[in-house]
């Protein structure tokens, strides 16, 4: 008789994420580089290791675990994964949400800039930087439907 595989506990998921994050920090040599380069390397790592997948019935697609461990996520998974790295390096960041989308704001070089890993991801393991560290004005020039957020929560954000 086969046994049904059990889902990992929350503690096990956290441990797996922590182990992977430590490996990524080492692999990408993140400790002795400037914040802009860190952000770019983390952005690219997540995009190279995550597939956008809203069709699975797995709740983990909404979390960093889905993005970093399982390799499948929706916008909240991308944003959560990115935030973990930003928090480790004490780079100020905020998760921003509209009615049905989520992305990040990062404070770098004296400015709050938007970064949307989900929208920088594309099929066939390719990605671009259209939503990489952009101002609010640039964000709104690219999209106003999914990125319409309540700006009053982010008064200082550009």
Question: Where are each of the predicted segments found?
Answer:
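Generic structural motif
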Residues: 12, 92-96, 149-152
């Amino acid at each position: 008789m086969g046994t049904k595989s059990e889902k990992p506990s929350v503690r096990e998921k956290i441990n797996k994420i922590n182990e992977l994050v430590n490996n990524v920090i080492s692999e990408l040599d993140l400790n002795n580089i400037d914040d802009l380069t860190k952000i770019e390397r983390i952005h690219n790592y997540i995009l190279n290791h995550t597939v956008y997948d809203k069709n699975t019935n797995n709740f983990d697609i909404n979390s960093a675990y889905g993005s970093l461990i399982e390799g499948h996520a929706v916008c909240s998974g991308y944003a959560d994964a990115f935030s973990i790295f930003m928090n480790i390096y004490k780079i100020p960041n905020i998760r921003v949400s509209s009615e049905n989308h989520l992305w990040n704001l990062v404070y770098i070089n004296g400015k709050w800039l938007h970064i949307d890993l989900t929208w920088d991801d594309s099929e066939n393991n390719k990605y671009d930087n259209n939503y990489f560290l952009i101002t609010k004005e640039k964000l709104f020039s690219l999209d106003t439907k999914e990125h319409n957020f309540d700006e009053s929560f982010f008064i200082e954000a550009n």
